[in-house]
A protein has these predicted regions:
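Glycine-rich, proline-tolerant flexible connector loops at the mouths of alpha/beta enzymes
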Residues: 54-72, 112
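Alpha-helix-loop-beta-strand connector modules within alpha/beta enzyme cores
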Residues: 65-88, 121-137
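Conserved anion-binding
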Residues: 22-31, 98-101, 105-146
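Short, acidic/polar
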Residues: 36-47, 92-98
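Catalytic cores of alpha/beta
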Residues: 81, 85-107
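N-terminal amphipathic alpha-helix/helix-capping segment at the start of soluble metabolic enzymes
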Residues: 4-27, 139
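Hydrophobic faces of well-ordered beta-strands that scaffold small-molecule active sites
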Residues: 10-15, 55-57, 85-89, 108-110, ...
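Non-catalytic positions within long, well-ordered alpha-helices that form the structural scaffold/packing
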Residues: 48-51, 101-102
Length: 146
């Protein structure tokens, strides 16, 4: 019998990528990084083996710099996993969104661009129904776009 919570919510494990490694930032501080693994594909496969039905990736380099540096890891993960993979972090243009959706990602998460260019989000959502998520961060009770 399935646990009751499975009927009401989906728990999605996340991997934060920084310079190709799996990390965790302390309260979003890039100066306080804990490196968990240098092998993102192995980490992702571990979540799948533990029963994950979806995986959430965050490109921290993309989020901070606006430039992707973890595409190799992202592509390798999407290729290796049997479950859907979604990604957020640094997706700030239609071209980048299309590139990510074409590389095998199931969904992409738009943050800053959703606040700065909402018409882009609408256009992408029309072209890719069900594949665009808007993620809004908050800090001290206010929207924190970056």
């Amino acid at each position: 019998m399935d646990p009751l919570w499975q009927h009401f919510m989906e728990i999605i494990p996340a991997i934060d990528l920084l310079d190709g490694a799996c990390v965790r930032l302390h309260q979003g501080d890039y100066d306080q990084v804990t490196r968990f693994s240098e092998e993102p594909v192995a980490q992702a496969l571990g979540w799948q083996e533990q029963g994950a039905t979806r995986l959430h990736l965050v490109d921290l380099d993309g989020a901070k710099r606006g430039e992707p540096t973890n595409d190799g890891a992202v592509r390798a993960i999407t290729k290796a996993l049997q479950v859907p993979v979604q990604l957020g972090g640094g997706v700030r243009s239609a071209e980048r969104a299309e590139e990510l959706l074409d590389c095998g990602l199931d969904r992409i998460i738009l943050g800053t661009v959703a606040i700065e260019t909402p018409q882009l989000v609408c256009a992408l959502a029309e072209r890719h129904p069900g594949r665009i998520i808007v993620g809004i961060d908050a800090k001290n009770g206010r929207v924190a776009p970056r």
